[in-house]
Amino acid sequence: MHALNLQPKTITLAERLADLAVDALIDEADLSPKPALVDRRGNGAHTDLHLGLMHASALALWPAFKEMAEAALEFGEIGLPLREAIGRIGREGEQAMLATTHGVNTHRGAIWALGLLVTAAALDTKSTSAGAVTLRAARLALLDDRYAPRPLSHGAQVAQRYGARGAREEAQLGFPSVVQRGLPQLKRSRAAGHGEQNARLDALLAIMTDLADTCVLYRAGEQGLHAMQHGARAVLDAGGSASLTGRRRLHELDQQLIALNASPGGAADLLAASLLLDRIERDGILQGAF
């Protein structure tokens, strides 16, 4: 009788980064209670989304994230060839997402944000702090993909109308909502002993306090954005999601945003980006990949 071989299979760096990106998307989807977003309780302000669809969409994006990391390793430097390669891969990933979800846009913004971060992380595994990775991602985002389709997304239309910073500008600036809001709040809440789920909720709320979320602007206009930002600040000012008063404020915010049809999908994408960077930075997870 042969002993079972329990040695874990060695995975490549690209595979590991793709795993982390998918994990971040699933962790974001599972996090509950999120205001007006799909979570374990229900569909939030959405009629076309549910948790199982979010999971399936995230898993469908694994090949695209892996190929982006492989492209970074192949090209080895920030430049137009790499930018256009990951742009093509991202568009292919979007088609895989839409095939899985039967045409529902679950993660278009996340493909952009997490794809850039996966690529940036793969470019230099010896420099994986959040600041270093987001700086490389910003340099990539600033390059113009000549093959990108030009029709304006909903987010881009709203960004033009309201003068808001869209997903492209967020990346080109080095993800300030992540580096200055999400990650610091995640670390503060952990240090205060609030527990991982509450720390992640607080990180989402911190992003929401300042983000001109184009998903909210598209669905609910400036009234919805004001409600999101001020409501998120009220939760944090009340002690965050780990406090009784903060939980009450969070419930109130959830109900208010649902009534306004204001779902902060941009903030959710940036929370997923925060969770990805946190895992890369905190656990040194890239060290064991080959």
Curated annotation (Swiss-Prot):
Key word Transferase present: yes
Enzyme nomenclature, EC number: 2.4.2.52
Superkingdom per UniProt: Bacteria
GO MF annotations, alphabetized: ATP binding; triphosphoribosyl-dephospho-CoA synthase activity
One of the GO biological process terms: prosthetic group biosynthetic process
Entry function: Involved in the formation of 2-(5''-phosphoribosyl)-3'-dephosphocoenzyme-A, the prosthetic group of the acyl-carrier protein of the malonate decarboxylase.
Pfam family, one: CitG
Family: Belongs to the CitG/MdcB family.
Name assigned to this protein: Probable 2-(5''-triphosphoribosyl)-3'-dephosphocoenzyme-A synthase
Record's keyword terms, sorted: ATP-binding, Nucleotide-binding, Transferase
InterPro entries the record matches: CitG (IPR002736), TriPribosyl-deP-CoA_syn (IPR017555)
Reactions it catalyzes: 3'-dephospho-CoA + ATP = 2'-(5''-triphospho-alpha-D-ribosyl)-3'-dephospho-CoA + adenine
